[in-house]
């Protein structure tokens, strides 16, 4: 067996041999300091190159733009992923790449028994209402010393999408080599049930590679959006293609620097997406059954936050962040109901807008910008806006806050914070969780840190109270967790896992 096939030997050689060579070099007599210095540089360069070439080490960036060296991902990871899937699948044809002109093209499906039935509670991005709240059943708040019970854990493709779940299946979208792949997994076992793929590879040095938007489930269909704008409607039981559109090409829009990241929103028979095209093509609605265009609105460049449905000021409306403002749009035709300028230093809005009262909306951005609560008052066929408060006490970068009993909890540039939603007053701030994500369940915050730890924090305004913590994933973790049928689902660029979090 070649040395490159023995990772432990390679790592040991890379870590031990260069220092040994340096020691021997500097102990050698009769060699000038200049030659020893050149030799030392050569040894270090060879050692580092060895790690990059043979052990898969690569450079990536944290959410704070800090340089991180990682041994995860790359060719070695793809081989592990493919070997794992092959080992756990019944004999089946190879993945069939569905062509745009062939809406009936089948996806790869297993000839094995169907998964156990389950609910469709967490069928949307961030759960019901896109609020990040799990209320289906109580969660365990007294965790064992070693952490929650692990139900399953396995490799996964790249990207930053979360999970949705319905009828015993968990859905996500991944990068596998040069394909974007929508995958359905048995939520109880982690076994892959079907995949549907197309050619696409979005790459970005700072932000990483792969799809970002989370697929959503509605009435037996999965709606998935790739990082390069490919929108697909699939049968949720089989992965069979129903229809597809590239929302960038269809609306004359250019891709964002960090890729398409906003999850589709299905409402009133329409699929709402944000391609960011001009001439009324910034926010677009397609018919959920046929994929035909229903309406288009605005001329703004897109943001990274996902559209949200909420009732504010007595009117059911779409809350949308664009690159330069927060807006409310009429569901039926996309008509602008209100707007509020919201321009960040980097032109990036990635946190979800939240309806925090009958007539109030919370918005936030990172990059030193901050947060605000807007009050909407009916005026004519729309609303006028008034700022209740605005400050920099909560800067949600590419994670979103949750509201609990009058207080907002969120990551303020990587540090957990609690803010009074009425006044904007900072109640506490502490604990470094990196640019991770969080959910609210049973009066507690379930935080998935940037380093892959799962942390339980009591949602209380008095002080930061960390209850429990355990390591769930290895490597940089920006993906939002999901909770369905008592299981906590987590993933990052290289692995995915399920943990039993239900109290019963």
What are the residue ranges of the model-derived segments?
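Short coil/turn segments that connect the beta-strands within blades of beta-propeller domains
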Residues: 167-168, 219-220, 268-269, 315-316, ...
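Internal/C-terminal transmembrane anchor helices
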Residues: 35-58, 72-73
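Hydrophobic, aromatic-rich membrane-embedded alpha-helical segments
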Residues: 7-26
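Short loop/turn segments immediately following the C-termini of beta-strands
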Residues: 67, 74, 127-130, 175-177, ...
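Loop/turn-rich, solvent-exposed surfaces of beta-rich toroidal or solenoidal domains
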Residues: 369-371, 393-459
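Blade-level signature of beta-propeller repeat domains, shared across WD40, Kelch, NHL, RCC1
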Residues: 369-371, 452, 476-504
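Aromatic (tryptophan-biased) beta-strands that constitute blades/sheets of beta-rich domains
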Residues: 67-155, 181-183, 188-204, 240-253, ...
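Extracytoplasmic beta-rich repeat domains
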Residues: 147, 151-164, 195-216, 244-266, ...
């Amino acid at each position: 067996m070649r040395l490159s096939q023995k990772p432990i030997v390679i790592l040991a050689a890379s870590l031990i041999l260069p220092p040994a060579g340096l020691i021997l070099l500097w102990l050698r007599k009769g060699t000038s300091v200049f030659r020893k210095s050149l030799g030392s540089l050569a040894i270090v360069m060879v050692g580092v190159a060895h790690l990059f070439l043979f052990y898969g080490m690569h450079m990536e960036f944290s959410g704070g733009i800090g340089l991180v060296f990682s041994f995860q991902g790359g060719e070695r990871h793809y081989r592990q992923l493919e070997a794992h899937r092959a080992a756990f699948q019944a004999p089946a044809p190879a993945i069939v790449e569905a062509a745009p002109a062939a809406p009936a093209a089948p996806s790869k499906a297993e000839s094995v028994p169907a998964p156990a039935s389950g609910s469709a509670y967490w069928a949307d991005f961030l759960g019901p209402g896109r609020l990040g709240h799990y209320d289906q059943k109580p969660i365990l708040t007294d965790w064992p010393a070693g952490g929650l019970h692990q139900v399953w854990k396995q490799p996964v493709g790249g990207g930053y999408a979360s999970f949705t779940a319905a009828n015993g299946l968990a859905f996500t979208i991944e990068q596998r080599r040069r394909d974007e792949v929508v995958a359905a997994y048995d939520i109880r076992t982690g076994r892959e049930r079907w995949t549907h793929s197309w050619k696409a590879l979005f790459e970005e040095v700072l932000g990483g590679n792969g799809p970002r938007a989370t697929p959503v489930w509605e009435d037996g269909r999965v709606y998935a959006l790739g990082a390069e704008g490919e929108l697909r409607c699939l049968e949720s039981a089989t992965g069979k293609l129903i229809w597809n559109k590239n929302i960038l090409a269809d609306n004359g829009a250019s891709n964002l620097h960090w890729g398409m990241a906003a999850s589709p929103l299905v409402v009133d028979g329409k699929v709402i997406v944000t391609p960011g095209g001009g001439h009324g093509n910034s926010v677009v609605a397609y018919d959920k059954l046929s994929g035909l265009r229903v309406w288009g609105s605005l001329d703004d460049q897109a943001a990274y936050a996902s559209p949200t449905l909420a009732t504010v000021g007595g009117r059911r409306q779409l809350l949308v962040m664009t690159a330069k403002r927060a807006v409310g749009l009429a569901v039926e035709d996309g008509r602008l109901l209100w707007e509020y300028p919201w321009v960040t230093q980097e032109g990036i809005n990635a946190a979800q807008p939240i309806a925090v009262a009958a007539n109030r909306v919370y918005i936030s951005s990172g990059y030193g910008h901050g947060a605000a609560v807007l009050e909407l008052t009916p005026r004519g066929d729309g609303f006028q806006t008034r700022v209740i408060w605005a400050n920099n006490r909560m800067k949600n970068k590419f994670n979103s806050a949750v509201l609990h009993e009058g207080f907002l909890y969120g990551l303020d540039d990587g540090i957990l914070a609690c803010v009074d939603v009425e006044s904007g007053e900072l109640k506490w701030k502490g604990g470094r969780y990196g640019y991770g994500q969080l959910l609210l369940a049973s009066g507690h915050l379930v935080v998935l840190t940037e380093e892959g730890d799962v942390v339980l924090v009591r949602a209380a305004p008095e002080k930061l109270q960390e209850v429990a913590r355990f390591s769930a994933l290895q490597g940089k973790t920006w993906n939002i967790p999901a909770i369905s049928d008592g299981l906590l689902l987590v993933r990052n660029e290289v692995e995915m896992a399920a943990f039993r979090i239900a109290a019963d």
